[in-house]
Structure formats: C-alpha cells, structure tokens
Amino acid sequence: METWQEVTVHVHRDAQEAVSHVLIETGSQGVAIADSADYIGQKDRFGELYPDVEQSDMIAITAYYPSSTNLADVIATINEQLAELASFGLQVGQVTVDSQELAEEDWADNWKKYYEPARITHNLTIVPSWTDYDASAGEKVIKLDPGMAFGTGTHPTTKMSLFALEQVLRGGETVIDVGTGSGVLSIASSLLGAKTIYAYDLDDVAVRVAQENIDLNQGTDNIHVAAGDLLKGVSQEADVIVANILADILVLLTDDAYRLVKKEGYLILSGIISEKLDMVLEAAFSAGFFLETHMVQGEWNALVFKKTDDISGVIGG
C-alpha cells in the first residue's frame, strides 16, 4: 500500500493563498486549510451553529506529498519561500512546520474534514464539490474542489473581491479575471450574470485547477481560461476587470487595465496589504481611474475603481 507524507504549516491567515501556492509548487498533491474563522457564525449541513471555537490569526495548511518525495528538501524550500514572502511585507506570523506519514486511504479523505459550505456574501455560498447542499431561494452556489485550489474562497481578499463583484455586476457584462487561481471569481461572475468571462493566470497549475473547478459548476461555459502574463497581449475590452494578487503585481497592470476597461466600467483590485495601499492607489490614479469604493478587512484592502468622466462621488484621477 502506498503511503503519503503530510506536511502542516502553521502560518498567519493573511498568508493563506501565498503559502498554498508554495505547497503546490513544491509538489503537493493537495492542500487543506483549517481556519477557526471559517466556523464563526456558520451552520453545519444540518442547520446547526458550530460550537464556539477559539479564534486565532493562525491557520494550519496541510499538504500531501508522495512517499518518494524528499521531505527535507521540500521543508527547506518551504522555509525559504516563507522568508521571501515575509520580505515582501506579507504577515506570516510565527511559522512552524510539522510532518508525518499517512496511509493512502487516510490521505484520500482526511483533508475533506476541514471543509463545510461557507456563506461568503448575501447571495454567494462556496460549497465543497463532494457535499450535497440545498440552496435557499436566491442563493448562488459556487462548487469548488479545494484539494488543489489556491485558497478556498474564505480569505479576506477573496471575500472582498466577491463583495465587489456582487455590487458592480448587473448582468450581460464582459469580465476579465487576472490571476484567476482557483477560478472562484470567474465562477462568481458567471453566476452573477456576466455574459462572458476571460480568466488568465501565469501558472499552468492554476489554469488547470481553475478549469476543473469551472467544470464543476453548471452554466459556466461562458468562462474562457488561458495562460497569460497579467494583461499583456490582451485586446478584449471589458466592463469589469478583477485582480486579487499581491500589490507589487497589481501596480504593473493598471495602465493595461485602463486601456481595456470600457467607459463607465470598473477595475477591482484586491490582495493589498495596508502598507502597500498608497502604492496601488497612486498607480491606479496615474492610469486615469477614479476610486469609488475602499473595503478593509484586517490588514487587507480591496479597491473598486471606475473609468468615468463623471467624477461626482468618486476620488482621485
């Protein structure tokens, strides 16, 4: 019987998506994220509130590697990457890394215990692909397989992106999703009525994972996924462009975004740690955008910009 190696990284929740990406890049065959915040105020599948749990800023990200993997090399790489993330200003907390061997049948189902349906916005609920879920009237369900996902949709940056999409989409729009990762923002855009969505990611693994998640959801044939370096080479105009990536990368796409966003269209930028906020604002204002909405959750910020000549109620430009 084949055995697997389990590596658990205890890290600040602000680093969830970045660390999940690192684990996939080092060869993990799946990741699971245990975050007490996911259960605060949530109900289980039987409609009962979860019992009170101690809230902490630290989460546990568990990755699974084949037995043939040199775990010492993997852990060394993980520690190097975590140090690099910290140098970019990302809060990683007091990191600890644990490991153990796991039988194959345990690996196949062990990580699933971490996931329950999560209501993210008024209309949007993220549901693990293996869970039977009865949606209420008006509730829109996004099915995800978090086993290979770049986050599960519960990170503050993703939540704020989903809130922003819910606010600006009215139906019939063209949306561009830059750095699509798990594809969750593209799927949400489709469910919220967008006509056509173009999803790009530089990472081939993300492109594949996004397509797999899109295929789990009905009515998402209007999402087109492709490898791409931000908005380079893109000529398709859009009513909405959304990007949930690191601030240092966001500032590189604002000029191209202004070129592609239609008049009266929106640019949604998330993944911005507070100390990088001014840098992103300056880049967007320099490109010609006006700020319409600023959302904050903890140390994270999301910004909704508009391309408009009517500057009443907006800032910057």
UniProtKB/Swiss-Prot annotation:
SUPFAM superfamilies per the UniProt record, alphabetical: S-adenosyl-L-methionine-dependent methyltransferases
The UniProt record lists the keyword Oxidoreductase: no
Catalyzed chemical reaction(s): L-lysyl-[protein] + 3 S-adenosyl-L-methionine = N(6),N(6),N(6)-trimethyl-L-lysyl-[protein] + 3 S-adenosyl-L-homocysteine + 3 H(+)
Protein's UniProt keywords contain Methyltransferase: yes
Keywords per UniProt: Cytoplasm, Methyltransferase, S-adenosyl-L-methionine, Transferase
Major location category of this protein: cytoplasm
GO annotation terms (biological process): methylation
Alphabetized InterPro entries for the sequence: Ribosomal_L11_MeTrfase_PrmA, Ribosomal_PrmA_MeTrfase, SAM-dependent_MTases_sf
EC class name: transferase
GO molecular function: protein-lysine N-methyltransferase activity
Protein localization: Cytoplasm
Assigned EC number: 2.1.1.-
Role: Methylates ribosomal protein L11.
Protein name: Ribosomal protein L11 methyltransferase
Source organism of the structure: Streptococcus pyogenes serotype M2 (strain MGAS10270)
